Amino acid sequence: MNKDKQFIKSFFIRMLILLAAVIAVVVIFDPFYHYHKPLPGLKAVLTDKEYQCIGTLRTFDYDSLIVGSSVCENYNNHWFDEGFDCTTIKAIRSYGATADLSYLLDAAYESHDLEYAFYNIDPSSLSASTEPTFESTGCPMYLYDNNIFNDYAYLLNKDVLLEKLPYMLANSFIGDYDEGDSYNWAQWKYFGRDMALGMYARLPSVRDMQPETVNSVELVGNIALLEAQVEEHPETTFKFFFSPYSMLWWDNAYRSGELDAVIYNEKQAIGALLEYDNVEIYYYQDDKDVITNLDNYMDMIHFSKDINYYIYDKLAKGEERLTKENYEARLDGMYILARKIVQEEIPKYYGK
């Protein structure tokens, strides 16, 4: 009997020691950067934005952010560091919804003062829900909340211990992993006309054009979220920009009956944001040479890293900036270009 008790006691002691060792290893190396920035000698290996982004915003050293959806993942942070004399990391959410990006900005501002926010506005973000979607889309909320009692899901996670941690260590010591390429997905992707056309599920018929105010409720809410960030942080220069989606996206906007609303939403958002002294807005959607060259794209939205650099370079030079005097004309020009694309460019691939 005593031997049985001794065995059970010994077993539990060993289990506790093992669990403590596992927890210690995860806390010390912390591949999701939940507790601290990388240890000296280790690189910030960032490949899982849903798991790592929130931690980096709380624990890394930086003074500027690249904020946006998946089209921002292929920027190299070092470009912005050199071009704007700052230290940059990314605040990325695949969907790019305003509420989600505002959540990430709030997390950053809890412990950091930001000099710049390089913020990509996706058209869809202006008509998206004004409630954060992290929980509803299955993100690991134990990494997002401040409840240490549910951290066991991270600390005692087999995948973290046997996959994520070794991957981080391997990339720190082997190969030429570039920390500036955080969350970059372009390396193994193919960009070209055939790929872009193949990924485009074109609507078989043209729907009736929706009223331009169809998303008014969501639009007002999303503009308010953007204005709140700008108003609450006058020390930050917000450099908002609109990225060049391909002509296939504009064709889809027309065929789905959303084109009028897209332009209206952008006009309303831009007009509101231009009222603030700490806001600059840059517009790259209407670059015809880029958006009509499908070799730049892998689908109707996502462009190659060359286009990311092209946008960065224009931002750094202050090119294509919108003002109160010119923004309506630029957006009207985009509307005309979109209709021209439908009438002249798209028929080259799909016929009349």
In which residue ranges do the predicted regions lie?
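Membrane/wall-proximal cationic-aromatic binding patches
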Residues: F29-K90, G96-A107
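Loop/turn elements at helix/coil->beta-strand transitions in domains of secreted/extracellular proteins
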Residues: D61-D63, C86, D113-Y116, H233-F238, ...
